Amino acid sequence: MEQTGTTIFRPPYSPVAIGAFAGRRRGMEFYPTRYTPSHKWSVEQGAIFVEVGMWYRSQWFPLPGETHWRESVDREVKQTRASVGICDVTTLGKIDIKGADVSEFLNKVYVNAFAKVPVGKTRYGLMLREDGMVMDDGTTARLSENHFVMTTTTANAVNVYRHLQFCHQCLWPDLDVHMISVTEQFAQYAVAGPNSRKLLQKVVDSNCDISNEAFPYMAAGEITVCGGIPARLFRISFSGELAYEIAVQTRYGDSLMRTLMEAGEEFNVVPYGTEALGVMRIEKGHAAGPELNGQTSAYDLGMGGMISGKKDFIGYKLGLREDLLRDDRMQMVGFKPVNIQDLLQAGSHLL
């Protein structure tokens, strides 16, 4: 070493234990954290939070005297199904897509038909990876002739956006399509339950008709709320009840949450978190994160009927592999205890 010398000296100049670099876990100090627009309000309500895809989301809202999370979640579910509940769903990925060829583009990335979605309508779509496995699901609404807005699951927001960019830039660069992620630019709330329309009618400006006849199931549109604030309204349901999702620019998010809760007092409105959201989507039979784990096909999830046989799309060929069409593959099913007093614990093994 003395004869040959060394390369340019760089720190560390003497051996350092790897543990000095890694250190012990420092909690969330080195993690970026995103808060939803209703975070401040939720903290004021004593919400319990959970980290989901680098977001902090309200898990449930305990009331004084509730000592177990199930008490809070059961109350939130029951009140939502009986009257109305509000959930912050801002964390869902949101992608604005514009251009003359957006319909054709969406028709190539979703398994179901998107070529003729009418203006003012929303359609639920399923997206596959190239290997035929389910990548993500979500809704896409057509706000105008050449303007669509897509929603994705919270966990896959970045992956889906990256996938769409790859498809456009590498596979179909000639299509007139332009997209941008607006996940953090819009605050979005689910308003669900039998009284959801009555609550929204107190917030939506009077020149916007959201009656059942004017705004039917799966409708979408740009409206105004609270005296002229631009908003987007979607009549979609993650819970099985009459429900809407309303989106405003993020800077209005906190105010809108407070306004919705105040407007819903006469209906005994309840805020609900991710646990209640999960309960209601299971009761509805809606597939979500635990099922979209990268190892399931559309047929495994009972969604084979959505697949169009009249077009090609990403994952179509490999989705028809013999192994994916076996009759003995695991299928998503729902369980209900014979004795309603028996609890099915999460993570239990079926023998």
Regions found by a protein language model. Name each.
Residues 75-82, 127-137, 173-175, 225-233:
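Short amphipathic beta-strand starts and helix->beta connectors
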Residues 86, 94, 126, 139, ...:
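Conserved hydrophobic/aromatic beta-strand scaffold that supports enzyme active sites
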